[in-house]
Amino acid sequence: MQKDYMKLHSNSDFDADQLDEHDDNVFQDVYDTGFDDGYIKANQENLIANQYKKLDKNSYQNGNNSFYTKDELEKLKKQSFQVNQDIDYYQQAQTEISSERQRLLQAIDDLEANQDQFHPEDFQAERQYLINELDRLDSELYHIEQYKNDSIDFVNELNQRLSAEQAKIDSYNSSLDKNIRKDYIQIDQLKNKLAEETTEYNDLLNRSTDEISEIDRQSERLQNLIDERIAKLNNDSYGVSSLDSSTRERLKKEIHDLSEQRKKLQSAKKLHLYNLNLKKESIRRYRSQLEQYLESLKQMRNEHNKKLKGYAQNLDNIKNEVEKAKQNFNDQQLKILQSKANADQYFALRKIELENSYKKAKNAILEANKAHAKNVQEEQALANKNNKTQRLLNKLKEDYDRLKIASLSFESMRKQSLAALNNLQDELKQKHNLLERKKHEQDGIVNEKISELEGYRSDLVDQKLKIEREKENQERRYKAAEASLNKKRQEIDELFLEANTKLNEASLKENDLNNQKREILAKLRNLEHLKSEIDQRRRDLDQRELIDQQTIRKIQLDVESERADLQRILLIERKKNDERQQELLQYERDIKRQQTDFENTVNWEQKKLSQREKELKDGYEQLQLKQSEVQEKIDELNEEINRAQKSKQNSLVLEQKLKSDLEHLNLSKNYLDKQQEELNQKSDKMIEDLKVFERDLKRQKEDLSIYEKSLQQKEASLINFQNDVTVQKNEAYHKAQAIHQELELKKAAIENELRKLTAERKAVDADKEENTKLKKFIDEEIRSLANERKELEIYQNNIENFKNNAVDRLNVLESDLVKKRNELEQLKKEQQTHYNELNSNLTNELQELEEQKKKFAHQKQQKFEELLQAKNNLSIKENELVLYAQKVNDRYNELKAIEKSNTAKSEMINAKLEEFKHAEIDYLNYQNKIKQEQIKFDNQVKILESQYNQRNEILLIREEQIKQKKAEQQAQEKQIQKDFKRLQEEKNNFDDQKRNKFNKISNLYLEIKKQRDEVDLAQRQIEDQKEELLIKAREGRLQKQEIEDRLAVLEKSEKRFRQEDELLAKKRIDLIERIGVLKADINKKHEILSLRSVQLTEKAKKQQEKDADLQRKFDLLESEVERFNEEKKSEFQKLKVERDKLAHREKNVSKNMNEINLALAKLDLIRKNNKVDKAKINEKLALLNDQKEKIDRENDLLDAKKTEVITRLRKMENDLEFEKQKVLLDRSNIERISSDQQALARELETKYQTLEREKRSFSQRKENELKEIDDFYQQVQHKERTLNLKIEDLKQLRYLLEKESYNVNVNKKDLKVRIEHYQRLERAIKNEQHKLNNQKNNFFNKVELLNDQLNKKSSKIALLRSKIYNTYKQQQQQKQILLEEKHKNSQLRKSLLKTQEELHQQKAQFSIAKKQEEKKLKNQKDLIQNTLSEVIKQKDQITNIKQEVDLKQTQLNNLEKLIIKQRADLQKELEKNSENTYRLQKAERLLEEKKTKLRLEYDKAKKVLSTAKATDQALKTKQAKVQDQFKKLVLINKKIIEARNNLLKQRNIIQKEINNRNMANFQNPYPNFLNLAPNTQVVPAQTIMPVQTPQLVGVNYPNQPAFDFNNPLMQMQQLINQQQMLMMQKEHQWALEEANKKNSRLAKQLKQLKHHKQALTESTSEHLNYHNLLNADNSYKINSLQNLLSKVAYNTKRRINQLEHNLDPETADLNQLHELNANSQLLDEIRTVLSNTTTNTNAVVPANSYSKELRMLFDEIKADFKKQAVLFNTQKEVFTNQINQLAQAVEQGPIEVRKTLESQDQKYQQMFDNFRDAYEQNISLLRNENNEVQKKLTDLYDEIAAIKTNTEKIKKTTLRPEVRNNANEGLASFNSVNRDKKDYLDQTLPVHQNLRIDLNQNRDLSHAKKERINQLANEIKTIKELIEKRKQTSL
């Protein structure tokens, strides 16, 4: 019961409820034995009654709501002083009780020795009294020791908790300082960046404003120049001023050039504005980052305040616990004082009783003296009684003196402990003050930084307002239509201001929170409640932080999405406005064109058409370039999206790593706990061993005392008295020594505490230095980690040394005991002779034993303290690990939040891209609708154009989709490569881990061996001792009882050693089990790696199949694009309004470019934000990695098997999910592409409905055949999959190989049947192709007939031109009559100009109204875009806006109709005024109708050609598909054969291995091959069996070699062999993949050869067409020259006849001379024309005739053809080589493939022969045509020579001198006039008009000649251009 009572009050954490758990509640008094009084018992029972009263929990709370005051600290000091005082008192009482116990034992021995001197009753009473006193002292000693230990544990726990709290505060302050410093550094960097960006923005703004102003000036200047030239052209068109055709062309060219310059300036201006916007967005981004850092600082401040609250609460809890302990200690002190008072009272009563007995004894002595004479024996008895009483009195006096000394020492120790506690409390106060100072300083720093940042933010807001004002001014200056955008930007700024107000509110809330913090700090007192509340609040705060971060990110994303939506709406509105402006401009151009068409001649139209063709070609090339640029930007976007996905994957990998690190930490913590438990067990065992040793020593001591008693019985009373004196001396000496040792122990404890305090001070100083020197923090941490590691190693070494020292000491003590036994035996032999020496030796030996015992106790205490320190260090490290785990969890949560934000961002990006695409598609559909409404008022040409636009857009979308798929496939290929690299890295890591584990296992094995050897040595020593004791027992040197005791001790030690041996055996078994588990894990990892490698190979195969499908689809697209380009070229040549449409399309493309640029800018912003987030994450990860390295260094010996398995499984799950998502995406993309293809097919079917029924049936048949081929291809794929599955079955079950080979043969037969079916299909396709060729030939015949009809119609047009010219003559004759009518017409024209100006004014008003309406629309759209929740309403409003736009469109159409009506009225008035104009208009209408008919016929012919080409192209694609299928079949066959060969090779290798008896450590290289499933594998429980080789069918196996089951080296060797076999498997797979790549390369080369041959055929056809055109042009020119020469000859003859008959003799000479001069000039001009024609055409006649250039041309053509023939031969040789290679590769394939290849070779040979024959025929035709041309030219030159001779004859006739003089003067004047005219013509006319002839004498002939010569010059110019182009193409 006394034990229960001491247990109740031994620990401070005791609760009153625990009393109910005890069964025995009866109290037994300590002092009840040997006492007759009952007052002590009553007091004890009262104390027990008070102890059973329960205390309320609320009674421990303090009423004060503040920190500790001075009074409370004094109380704490007193309390701790009391605790230490009690501890010291109990220690002193323990020593006193032990000394009193020794004294009582001695007294009992003395009493038993002097038993004869006492009365029997007195002897029994005295002996009973001493025994009771001894029992009481034993019980009191036990309880005092127990209570002392409990109080020491309680004080140690308090100190540990205080040190832990201090360490938490210090670590938190250091981490907070680091974070704050880092944030401030980043904020300073952002400040610098912002300053730089603002300066750059201001510089750029100034520069851009200057440049934009210059651009505006230049654009205004260019606009004025354009207006001037347009005015000139208008004056020319209205007849105000007449211009030549050359000046008109020059003016139009200048207008075109000026407009292009103006466009360039406008694009430069847009670039400047775009750069300004980018800079502004970057500034906003940096500002948002600064605001984020502000918010993070505020959050850190909140966290800091909360942590301080927590620490204050912990301090209050400790205070409450101290108060509880104080109360318990007060109760104990009261008990001790009461017991002390009771003891004093007892001793006083006992003293009185002794004094009474002394008086009685004196009386008895007097009576004895009186009766001395009577009896001597009675006197002796009385003397003995007197001696006894005297002895008792002396003992009582000694007890009284001893108690006095103890009380004095107790008081001195109390004073010392009070002083030490005062020092400790002062230091605690100083630390508390330092912490408060640090807190205030940090709060001040944070507030200062926040105020600085808020000031900087206000500056930024001012700068932002300035920038926005400047931008508003610029936008007002340049674009009035952007007012709505500025409003939106102002709204966004208002949102920012609202965010700022929210930040201010948050700061106010923070102040409120600070006020609440002070109130909360005063209120929180209870420890257990506060701990739970703190944990809950921490969790809530973490959740709130995550929620706040998510809300902030959501707000940012919403703002960005609103901004993007606004920009998108603005762009859409701009597009619509631009479209409307383009429509108005087009309408104006149409009006102008209609006005100019009335007055332009037919020649002008021809020139215009030629120029338009060039411009259209240039525009088409520019369009293609722009399309390529747009495609490149789309590819960049795809790459950015792929990068975002990769960053997402990287973030997933980081998350998995952190999870694995967390699991590692948890395992390390568990392992440390296990180690700690093992150390505790070892320490307990050591303590138990030491206790056993002490007991043995006590027993030895008791044995010696018994032996001494036997010796002392023979001594006399004097010797007894002397012994008593010596014993008392020894006791006093021992007491003094004990007190001295206790003082030294206390001194050592105080010194340890001082060392701890100095260490804490040093730690505080180190923290301060770390705060001042953050740069050296990493190095110091690394050093501290190294020191900690060294300390751990030292600690481990100390434990091992302690163990070794303890064993050594035990051995030494045992050897000492043996020596002492020998000495005792010698003393026993010489007991009679050397008794005094024996006694002194015994006393010395006893003293030495006691000194050794004290030393051992001292060492024990030191080691116990060292163990406590190690335990404290371990607990501190455990707390640090817990904190680190919490930090890691927080980081993990942060990374999860970042991942969520990244995924949200990526989803937003994808959503925006999809919205962008949908908006673009909607926009295109809307544009098509508008175009369809416009097409109602236009002709069939515009219908064709809209169809072309639709088709082009669809093709572009398809090209974009295919390119996106290509980019995705490239990304997948990169991912596969990365997976392979990662597998290699994992393999290397696995090898390293394996080596490390192997080393660890070998070290453990060696350690176990060492321990086993030590145990064996100890067992041997014990057996030696046993043998010695048995020998001594035989000799009879020791007594039986001693031998039995020794044997019992030795048996106990033997049992202990057996237990240790069993523990070692268990450890060994555990190690073997761990090796087995490790081996199983390694096997699982190998299986996982092999599965992953198989999956990667399957992925690669699927990727290759997808690439092939995409390549095929891309080839189809290219063929469609080529066909479409051909149609487009033919349509471009005939369309009128294409140039304006191209300009419109260019503007649309530029708008799309702007949209894409904006999207790219957004993506750049997102990418930069991601980079910033990545940088933050990388920094945090760097810190985490540093901490991880620390923990890894500390925990090198930890096993991570479970975590590796879990992480592998999770990675596999994530990989599977990722691959699943990829497969789903691929499926969705394929479905989308198939749907697009179906839509395209439907569109093509609608377009080709006009074709004949035969073509429809053919197309249906073609589609059916394609479907059959697709089904066939799918069946082949299905069979390929079944083959793969069968190959896997082959790998798993060896005996199914023959069945699978049989199935393969069956599949081969099926393939042969399919090939025959394919050949039938190919024949049918060839027949249909033959039919199509026939239809094509018929079509070409029809086209030739149409060309003939066109030629006839052109001749009719020429006749009409001549008629028009005749009417023009008649108009000139009636010129005088029409002058008055012209005056009237001019007046009418002026009125028309007025009406036109009115129309312009109406147009301007309309444009103003339109802009206003657009502004209204923009405002409405802005209102719609304010809220994201009203998306449905936006659609309705957009539809309303579209209806309003349609109404406006109808209004525009009505205005157009009004203008047309006005124009018709004006035309009617013109018809009334002039009948001649009516005739001209009628003739022009007839011409236009004929032109339209011709164009319609030409378009029909063109459509027929395009359909024929399309069918031809479809057949070609069919052939290509069939060839691809053949190639795939051949590859499948090859793969099957290779797989079979590989299996046979593997079988042979396995057979060889079996024969060579090397199958002990063999494992199949294929993990799924002949092995059991991973779930069926069994891991051995305790013993490890060797891996059995797979038993093959039909093979006799030898016996397995011997295998060491317990050797880990052999097991690791087995794992290494397995890895080598896996590497062989991987190399085999890589070889297969490289062979597949080579086959794909050969297939690509075959396709390239086919394309090259197609290009050759096209070039030859173009070459032949060129020669035909050249021959036709030459024949036409020769005929025209012949006609001209015949006219000249006729005119000269007629003139000569007139001169001979009609002229007078005086004037005849002059007229004759004039005509001769004119004829000579004509002849010279004809010669120049002929020379120009011969030089320009390059149609060279042979060298023997008149020109060398024709021969040069022929030579060049020959050389080109020879080069082409050489190229063709080389390509043919290359192709044949490749075919031979393919033939070698397909030797094992079917014979049909060879036949097809041979047939293709024959086709190519026939094509080559046909080309050669065609070339020879063309050369022969050219030679014949050149001979005919030469003949005609010789005839012409003969005629010219005859004319020359006639003129010279006329010149030779003599004239009179007067006539000659007059003639010479006339000739001089005539020549001067001609020279002036020539100079004027050279200056004004262009180069191609220098051949004009001005014949002034006869206007009729000169005008006709001029027109004819102009025609010839134009034709010559076109021929020149064609020849130059052909040269360029040939080069």
UniProtKB/Swiss-Prot annotation:
GO biological process: adhesion of symbiont to microvasculature
Keywords noted in UniProt: Coiled coil, Cytadherence, Virulence
UniProt keyword Coiled coil present: yes
InterPro entries according to UniProt: Cytadherence_Hmw2
Membrane-traversing stretches: none
Coiled-coil ranges per UniProt: 1626-1659, 1768-1846, 1903-1930
Free-text function comment from the UniProt entry: Component of the cytoskeleton-like structure which stabilizes the shape of the wall-less Mycoplasma. This cytoskeleton-like network of accessory proteins containing HMW proteins 1 to 5 allows the proper anchoring of cytadhesin proteins in the mycoplasmal membrane at the attachment organelle.
Name used for this protein in its record: Cytadherence high molecular weight protein 2
Gene assigned in the entry: hlp2
